[in-house]
């Protein structure tokens, strides 16, 4: 089903299911003996969502490499890709903490548990924004686990297509102090004009010294819809009915690095291939890589 301007979802369907895919990847990467990341909450959150495909995958009862067109190398590339992505953004927040930033905003937070697992200073406030049912689900599951946030956590149940800047201010965001922003795994699910509007709003809410991190996928411009459908087919055969070709917004859009620089940010990007190399992992062959191609991870600081 194609996206609409007011579509809704939970963590087992549509865009929401991609948050569960990401959490399952983090759970599997957390077990990797190389120890690149450690997210102890990813697995119980995925189990609570209850999608059998992901649970079997995490438990080793379902080997992705048995799927048509999914080799063992491609399956490993999926897990390794989630490991380097998670570490990049974990390190980003670590650098923000070291610089003295004491408020963070995680946009479209999904099953992100960084408020619970990163070593935040006690006076830090972490804001999380996502659809109401997503916020409620994660909050309740983590409470049932007895998990406690390691910072002051302020969860804001709002669709990012709504007036989230007003909601964020109402929740206590101090726009006179630097903020560390995160938009992880979000941009491909936004129309081009909404991507620009997101960074316009972030800029308007940011004091000098603020930072933002995200990733940009140049391949979204000429996204191979047929290849994405082909890759989704085998998953559908095993009970996971997610068609990525219907969830993302394709077509020309501004490059995030260029757009942020034009807004006064000092922005830099690093390719995922470089992150694989930096972390001592093999760079996947093109045939084993993401159907969107290369991914650029971006961090930026607002000059003042």
UniProtKB/Swiss-Prot annotation:
GO terms (BP aspect): methylation
Residues binding S-adenosyl-L-methionine, per UniProt: 130, 159-160
Molecular function per GO: methyltransferase activity
Protein EC: 2.1.1.-
InterPro entries to which the protein is assigned, alphabetical: Ppm1/Ppm2/Tcmp, SAM-dependent_MTases_sf, SAM_mthyl_Trfase_ML2640-like
Keyword Nucleotidyltransferase set for record: no
UniProt keyword annotations, A-Z: Methyltransferase, S-adenosyl-L-methionine, Transferase
Transmembrane segments: none
Top-level division of the source organism's lineage: Bacteria
Gene3D superfamilies for the chain: Vaccinia Virus protein VP39
Class of the enzyme per the UniProt entry, highest EC level: transferase
Family, similarity comment: Belongs to the UPF0677 family.
Function field: Exhibits S-adenosyl-L-methionine-dependent methyltransferase activity.
Protein name according to UniProt: Putative S-adenosyl-L-methionine-dependent methyltransferase MUL_0816
Organism listed in the record: Mycobacterium ulcerans (strain Agy99)
Taxonomic path: Bacteria, Bacillati, Actinomycetota, Actinomycetes, Mycobacteriales
């Amino acid at each position: 089903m194609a996206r609409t301007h007011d579509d809704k979802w939970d963590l087992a369907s549509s865009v929401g299911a991609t948050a569960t895919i990401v959490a399952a990847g983090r759970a599997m990467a957390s077990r990797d003996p190389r120890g690149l990341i450690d997210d102890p909450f990813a697995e119980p959150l995925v189990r609570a969502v209850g999608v059998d495909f992901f649970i079997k995958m995490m438990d080793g009862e379902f080997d992705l490499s048995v799927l048509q067109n999914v080799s063992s190398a491609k399956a490993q590339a999926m897990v390794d890709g989630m490991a380097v992505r998670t570490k990049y953004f974990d390190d980003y927040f670590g650098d923000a903490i070291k610089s003295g930033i004491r408020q963070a905003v995680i946009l479209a937070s999904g099953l992100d548990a960084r408020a619970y697992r990163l070593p935040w200073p006690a006076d830090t406030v972490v804001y999380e924004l996502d659809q109401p049912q997503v916020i409620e689900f994660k909050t309740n599951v983590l409470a049932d686990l007895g998990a406690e946030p390691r910072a002051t956590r302020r969860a804001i149940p709002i669709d990012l297509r709504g007036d989230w800047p007003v909601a964020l201010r109402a929740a206590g965001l101090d726009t006179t102090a630097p903020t560390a922003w995160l938009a992880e795994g979000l941009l491909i699910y936004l129309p081009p004009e909404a991507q620009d509007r997101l960074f316009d709003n972030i800029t308007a809410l940011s004091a000098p010294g603020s930072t933002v991190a995200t990733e940009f996928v140049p391949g979204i411009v000429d996204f191979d819809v047929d290849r994405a459908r082909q890759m989704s087919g085998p998953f559908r055969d095993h009970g996971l009915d997610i068609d990525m070709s219907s969830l993302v917004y394709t077509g020309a859009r501004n490059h995030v690095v260029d757009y942020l620089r034009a807004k006064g940010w000092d922005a830099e990007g690093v390719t995922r291939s470089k992150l694989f190399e930096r972390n001592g992992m093999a760079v996947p062959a093109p045939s084993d890589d993401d159907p969107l191609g290369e991914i650029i991870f971006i961090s930026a600081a607002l000059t003042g």
